């Protein structure tokens, strides 16, 4: 009972402090918004890394030339960045329309709430940039290695290190277990790369 009373007193004091210091509340909300943006950027970079590395390994399973792998990776970077940007733009536009309609009903159009709404163009640019940052990692890893086996190994190794780093950052931002989150991201990336490489090897072996 005493613990409950202490908790209630603590909550009451916190509310009183927040009410007396609205700037602190605004700072907390701003930090939370920034953390969400950063976490979305990490996820976008992870998508770019996994999809591009898997695409390059899939092409590498059929063709041993470095040029073919690099060109396929660059094409994947461009296509993925455009797809992410367009998808994010459409998604944020839809969200913005809904929130503007709500502000219209509340009679708050033109106020601070409207100015605080997310920008579709900024969201699209950020999404494309994040994807590109992740996608360029395997491209740089494979672009300067002539030996086929070494190139494949380096792409997998560099992608694994980057995946672990992305998983670590995502865990810190989401306040989750770092080791478990990083392992989950790395294992997921390995699964995507392994399945793509293996299926393309079977495709090559079938002679189709």
Curated annotation (Swiss-Prot):
It is a multi-pass membrane protein. Pfam families: VIT1 (PF01988). The chain crosses the membrane at residues 42-62, 70-90, 126-146, 152-172, 185-205. Keywords: Ion transport, Iron, Iron transport, Membrane, Transmembrane, Transmembrane helix, Transport, Vacuole. It catalyses: Fe(2+)(in) = Fe(2+)(out). Residues 63-69, 147-151, 206-208 are vacuolar. GO terms for cellular component: membrane; vacuolar membrane. GO terms for biological process: intracellular manganese ion homeostasis. Residues 1-41, 91-125, 173-184 are cytoplasmic. The keyword DNA-binding does not apply. GO terms for molecular function: iron ion transmembrane transporter activity; manganese ion transmembrane transporter activity. InterPro entries: Ccc1_fam. It is found in: Vacuole membrane. It comes from the Eukaryota. Probable vacuolar iron transporter that may be involved in the regulation of iron distribution throughout the plant. Belongs to the CCC1 family. This is Vacuolar iron transporter homolog 5.
């Amino acid at each position: 009972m005493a613990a409950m009373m202490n908790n209630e007193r603590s909550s009451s004091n916190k509310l009183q402090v927040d009410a007396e210091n609205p700037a602190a509340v605004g700072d907390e909300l701003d930090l939370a918004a920034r953390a969400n943006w950063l976490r979305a950027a990490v996820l976008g970079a992870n998508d770019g890394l996994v999809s591009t590395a898997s695409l390059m390994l899939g092409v590498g399973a059929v063709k041993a030339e470095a040029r073919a792998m690099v060109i396929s990776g660059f094409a994947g970077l461009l296509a993925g960045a455009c797809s992410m940007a367009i998808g994010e733009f459409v998604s944020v536009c839809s969200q913005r329309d809904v929130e503007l309609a709500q502000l219209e009903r509340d009679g708050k159009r033109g106020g601070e709430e409207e100015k605080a709404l997310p920008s579709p163009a900024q969201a699209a640019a950020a999404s494309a940039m994040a994807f590109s940052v992740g996608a360029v990692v395997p491209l740089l890893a494979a672009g300067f290695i002539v030996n086929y086996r070494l190139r494949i190994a380096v792409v997998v190794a560099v992608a694994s290190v980057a995946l672990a780093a992305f998983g670590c950052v995502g865990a810190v931002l989401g306040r989750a277990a770092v080791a478990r989150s990083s392992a989950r991201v790395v294992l997921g990336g390995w699964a995507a790369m392994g399945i793509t490489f293996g299926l393309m090897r079977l495709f090559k072996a079938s002679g189709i």
